Amino acid sequence: MKCKKPSALFSALALVGALGAASVLGAASANSASPVAAATVQASSGSAKTSVAATSKSQDGDVLAAIVRDLKITKTQAKKRIKLEEKARQLEPRLQKKLGKKFAGLWISKNGKKIVVGVTTKKAAKVVKKAGATPKIVKSNLTTLKKRATKISKNAPSDIKNVNSWWVDPATNKVVIEARSKKAAKAAATAAGLTAGTYEITVSDDVIVPVRDYWGGDALSGCTLAFPVYGGFLTAGHCAVEGKGHILKTEMTGGQIGTVEASQFGDGIDAAWAKNYGDWNGRGRVTHWNGGGGVDIKGSNEAAVGAHMCKSGRTTKWTCGYLLRKDVSVNYGNGHIVTLNETSACALGGDSGGAYVWNDQAQGITSGSNMDTNNCRSFYQPVNTVLNKWKLSLVTSTDVTTSYVQGYQNNCIDVPNSDFTDGKQLQVWNCNGTNAQKVSFHPDGTLRINGKCLDARWAWTHNGTEVQLMNCNGHIAQKFTLNGAGDLVNVHANKCVDVKDWGGQGGKLQLWECSGGANQKWWRR
């Protein structure tokens, strides 16, 4: 499927989903075009860690291949572009702070070869040149442009339903109004007090309606999960319009995965967050739908306009495009106006609530799409806005969490007599809060007690293999996963940690074929 240039009119912009797990199979991805150099650029308000450079090991071959495929560029071009994008990300907040009211936006050029910064004075242009970017002298600063765009929302005319969206375009230094007629666009501009020369009009026949797979009382299994946060996860607000207390289910098991704590659809936001249900715990990773692989998430630093952008969703899976513009006010109808970022990545029904990623940085939550795989345009809710709004913290792949692992007869995994010597077989014991029971979950998949790793003795894989404590050595026999079903699985043996002979206190731990028995069920406390 080939996407046209994003300057072409897009059709049937719509919401794209109802909640579901990120492991549900979906349709093939589609291609995306080069970006329009237009957007409002903001410094990231999140507290995420600095992203790695373009050559980061986390940018694995599968992810790079998707960028090459969807953006139709070579591998060498992709690597060069990613390096430039990282430079733009670092420059953006620094220049915005240094230039203040002289700053009028930052974006990456259409050819992906230079960083362009809008400024209002020649003196500011010299600062931009010194920083290694290309200045463009314009009339209005970014603050002024944003105020003009905001006036459209505050002074909407009676026929606002015929206005699809509006945004700031720093490349032209104007506000762009997209509507189904010039008359509707002019009415919006007039109501906002915008004068000729300060705005542009784009005419489109779009009918913007909610089209997600949602019916009253259904399981919302048609959406996608975005990012884990501490204590829960994020998804789209229109996937949880029932609000606080609504139960969300996962298509991995068909069972409950979370309970909505807060949601908002309209008044600028399309997001929801739910508390984890039962034994479910999120990891700082996003699937890219290629053989079960994924991308480690290390923060939420915002990418610059013109940067590549990839999306993970249950329907179109892993698709990539460009970040076209920021702070687009999208009118979904029925009073639902949301401020989103626009990309040329493809998204369809069921992708709502999914994750947008730039390199190893979380960017946003899938909200809407034009539902046209021949002219891909999609919109996401910036994740930092949501994290700040509800005071949430993103779970990242670099985090280490410590807890007690409880199981059969409510006993905890335990090192006998706090003897941390190599080769000590682990047991279950009455939970007592000692260091012998504190298990740390590490990003590399190891589980550690007192700095040593849980280990399958001699890397054996047969039933009855002892689970012991050993110095960490990087072998796959020391990697475990605790899934939502409560199975603690050794990755090497693909067998479950099991309490031998269904023993009580002092029962030894071994690996055994997963059976679903109570002596193989574990949870963190």
From Swiss-Prot:
Function summary: Major serine protease exhibiting lytic activity toward living yeast cells. Similar to elastase in its substrate specificity and has a lectin-like affinity for mannose. Mannoproteins may be the native substrate for RPI.
Prosegment residue ranges: 33-211
Signal peptide: 1-32
SUPFAM superfamilies: Ricin B-like lectins, Trypsin-like serine proteases
Designated name of the protein: Serine protease 1
Active site positions, chain numbering: H238, D270, S352
Source organism of the structure: Rarobacter faecitabidus
Cystine residue pairs: C223-C239, C310-C320, C346-C376, C412-C431, C453-C472, C496-C514
Pfam families: Pro_Al_protease (PF02983), Ricin_B_lectin (PF00652)
Organism lineage string: Bacteria, Bacillati, Actinomycetota, Actinomycetes, Micrococcales
A GO cellular component annotation in the UniProt record: extracellular region
Residues of the Ricin B-type lectin domain: 396-525
Record region (Essential for the lytic activity, but not for protease function): 401-525
InterPro entries tied to this protein: Pept_S1_alpha_lytic, Pept_S1A_streptogrisin, Peptidase_S1_PA, Peptidase_S1_PA_chymotrypsin, Ricin_B-like_lectins, Ricin_B_lectin, Streptogrisin_prodomain
GO molecular function ontology, one term from the record: D-mannose binding
Subcellular location as annotated: Secreted
Keyword annotations: Disulfide bond, Hydrolase, Lectin, Mannose-binding, Protease, Secreted, Serine protease, Signal, Zymogen
Family: Belongs to the peptidase S1 family.
One record GO biological process: proteolysis
Entry EC number(s): 3.4.21.-
